[in-house]
Amino acid sequence: MAKRVYAIAMRYAQALHELAKEQKSLDKWQEDLQNLSRLTEDASVDEFLSNPKIVSARKHAVLAKLSDIDPLMLNLVDMLVATRRLGIMRAISGEYNRLLNEARGVEDAIVTTAKPASEADTEIIRQQLSKITGKKINILTATDPGLIAGLKARIGDKLIDGSISRRLVLLQNEISQGRI
């Protein structure tokens, strides 16, 4: 089921990305998708939009008043409501961001540290990851005291684990196998 949702979201995102390129509105549409994603995650908004008793024109008008969203983006919401796919808005937004980053040579990295990293440390990490990947890096930070020290960086499907907890596990394995 998740693969199917992803495939559907990917098709919508690709179509939106192409249309946004034609309209020269890549950043505006990214912002609109993020806003719509946040809006549709609100239970009351989702309930309103999913209510079949409320006509589409009314839903469209309410959304238009709620935010400064491109009319073509409102058409997307209308289509998702009509096909009962509003629940994939977040996936569409995420996939659109991925396509936009890919086109710009940017990659997201989730960097987890034992305690919050300073801005200077984050910048050093960004530079090092940029050297490794050859791309610009957006860093999303997280903390996990279980790492003890060091960091883990997830870039796409790759994981760089430079944490002390990982080194301790490796050392424990070496000892248990009699190598040390």
From Swiss-Prot:
GO terms for molecular function: proton-transporting ATP synthase activity, rotational mechanism. It comes from Dehalococcoides mccartyi (strain ATCC BAA-2100 / JCM 16839 / KCTC 5957 / BAV1). This is ATP synthase subunit delta. F(1)F(0) ATP synthase produces ATP from ADP in the presence of a proton or sodium gradient. F-type ATPases consist of two structural domains, F(1) containing the extramembraneous catalytic core and F(0) containing the membrane proton channel, linked together by a central stalk and a peripheral stalk. During catalysis, ATP synthesis in the catalytic domain of F(1) is coupled via a rotary mechanism of the central stalk subunits to proton translocation. Belongs to the ATPase delta chain family. Keywords: ATP synthesis, Cell membrane, CF(1), Hydrogen ion transport, Ion transport, Membrane, Transport. F-type ATPases have 2 components, F(1) - the catalytic core - and F(0) - the membrane proton channel. F(1) has five subunits: alpha(3), beta(3), gamma(1), delta(1), epsilon(1). F(0) has three main subunits: a(1), b(2) and c(10-14). The alpha and beta chains form an alternating ring which encloses part of the gamma chain. F(1) is attached to F(0) by a central stalk formed by the gamma and epsilon chains, while a peripheral stalk is formed by the delta and b chains. It comes from the Bacteria. The gene is atpH. The keyword Cell inner membrane does not apply. Its main location: membrane.
